[in-house]
């Protein structure tokens, strides 16, 4: 069922995920480099961003004591050097929604995958799969180069460092012995101004129409990396205007647009992204928490609170229908741990059976990637077919039938399917992006048949 004849463009966010597996010796050496009282004092202060090594050590120790996953932004670009000297990375893999989606689709061997990120240093370019193309302008003409050959010297690099820790590890902080109560991970995510400008660069922008002629669909993501203000006087509004121009260029070439939404903590920035981008696209991918975030911005606070608190399928369906109507795009795709959902209007040309098949392709592709760690060829998809649907499948179906009896859904097509869930996944990062990419790909395929 893989639509190998389709071509996809993906932008804007790609980064390196550098994995560090923490052991007792590494943790102890880190702590010993500082006065234990200073570490304790900094833990009390609870730094919300990392500016210097002591900030990192304090937040890491705090996370290890609790045994709960955490993420803290790194705001000092000079700290890159300290991290690279201090740690040996177990693995460097491609991260960022646009990067993950490009590599997944390239693994399926579809006709063409064009990836675009405004920053392409060599270290990042080398993590993309063979077959992924990058647009460049040479002698005034648009060309598509293998992405590994298109890197630019001096481009800024975004590295998210993921520190994995195991339950039971012990270390000392002064006189105190600490045992880690649970396994988990501590993420240090790069948040420098130099890598937060989400845009199509000036050399490529005039050629977006030409790129649009080469593809059937485009998947945009990464808006959550924007800042409200920049040191040169630009702001989020400037970059969102440019992003909207990109979308309109593709739409004029009849390219279907999917946006993979992501949580944005800053409420004002979230509102700007929702109101400036989502009404102009065809398809939006979100999870339950993001349904609530969008509803809150649209003024449906009570329903948003219900979704955050109770997590009921019925509320998510109602919220999804409201989002679809308020923002007036074509189809909403919701991915959660236990179910996937499409909500679209009744006049959508796809039947409910075709919509269900599209979602099934998405969850099967994600199950294959979770099982194998990567999609290296079209046959890898079949591995996902062997993964059973999750243990709550019957419960999901029952709740969906109840929701149908309570909600007025006559004007909509709503399809809910259970997910395939891998018990011991090799990989968990980016599975929502994988589902969205697979579902959007097959959605395009069914649309073409109509």
Swiss-Prot record:
Cofactor note: Binds 1 Mg(2+) ion per subunit.
Localization of this protein: Cytoplasm
Pathway annotation: Carbohydrate degradation; glycolysis
Active site residues of this protein: 433 (proton acceptor)
Gene Ontology CC terms, in alphabetical order: cytoplasm
EC number: 2.7.1.146
Protein function: Catalyzes the phosphorylation of fructose 6-phosphate to fructose 1,6-bisphosphate using ADP as the phosphate donor.
Family in the record: Belongs to the carbohydrate kinase PfkC family.
Protein name as catalogued: ADP-specific phosphofructokinase
UniProt organism field: Pyrococcus horikoshii (strain ATCC 700860 / DSM 12428 / JCM 9974 / NBRC 100139 / OT-3)
Top-level taxonomy: Archaea, Methanobacteriati, Methanobacteriota, Thermococci, Thermococcales
């Amino acid at each position: 069922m893989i639509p190998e004849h389709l071509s996809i463009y993906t932008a804007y966010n790609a980064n390196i995920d550098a994995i560090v597996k923490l052991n007792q010796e590494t943790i102890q050496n880190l702590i010993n480099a500082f006065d234990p009282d200073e570490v304790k004092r900094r833990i009390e202060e609870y730094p919300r961003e990392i500016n210097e090594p002591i900030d990192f050590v304090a937040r890491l120790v705090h996370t290890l004591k609790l045994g709960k996953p955490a993420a803290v932004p790194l705001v000092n670009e000079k700290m890159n050097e300290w991290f690279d000297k201090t740690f040996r990375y177990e693995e460097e893999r491609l991260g960022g929604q646009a990067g993950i989606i490009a590599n997944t689709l390239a693994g399926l061997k579809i006709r063409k995958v064009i990836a675009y990120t405004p920053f392409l240093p060599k270290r990042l370019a080398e993590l993309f799969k063979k077959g992924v193309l990058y647009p460049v302008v040479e002698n005034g003409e648009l060309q598509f180069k293998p992405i590994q050959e298109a890197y630019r010297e001096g481009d800024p690099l975004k590295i998210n460092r993921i520190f994995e820790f195991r339950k039971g590890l012990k270390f000392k902080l002064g006189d105190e012995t600490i045992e880690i109560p649970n396994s988990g991970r501590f993420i240090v995510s790069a948040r420098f101004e130099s890598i937060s400008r989400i845009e199509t660069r000036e050399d490529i922008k005039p050629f977006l129409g030409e790129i649009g002629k080469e593809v059937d669909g485009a998947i945009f993501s990464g808006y959550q990396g924007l800042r409200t203000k920049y040191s040169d006087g630009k702001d989020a509004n400037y970059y969102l205007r440019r992003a909207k121009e990109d979308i309109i260029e593709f739409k004029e070439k009849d390219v279907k647009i999917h946006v993979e939404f992501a949580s944005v903590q800053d409420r004002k920035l979230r509102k700007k992204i929702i109101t400036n981008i989502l009404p102009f696209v065809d398809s939006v991918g979100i999870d339950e928490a993001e349904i609530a975030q969008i509803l809150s911005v649209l003024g449906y606070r009570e329903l948003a609170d219900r979704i955050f608190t109770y997590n009921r399928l019925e509320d998510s369906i109602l919220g999804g229908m409201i989002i679809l109507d308020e923002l007036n795009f074509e189809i909403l795709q919701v991915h959660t741990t236990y179910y996937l959902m499409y909500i679209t209007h009744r006049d959508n040309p796809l039947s409910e059976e075709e919509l269900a098949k599209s979602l099934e392709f998405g969850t099967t592709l994600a199950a294959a990637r979770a099982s194998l760690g990567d999609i290296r060829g079209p046959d890898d998809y079949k591995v996902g077919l062997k993964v059973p649907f999750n243990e709550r499948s019957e419960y999901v179906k029952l709740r969906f039938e109840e929701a149908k009896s309570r909600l007025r859904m006559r004007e909509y097509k709503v399809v809910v399917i259970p997910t395939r869930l891998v018990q011991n996944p090799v990989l968990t990062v980016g599975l929502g992006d994988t589902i969205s990419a697979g579902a959007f790909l097959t959605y395009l395929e069914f649309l073409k048949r109509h």
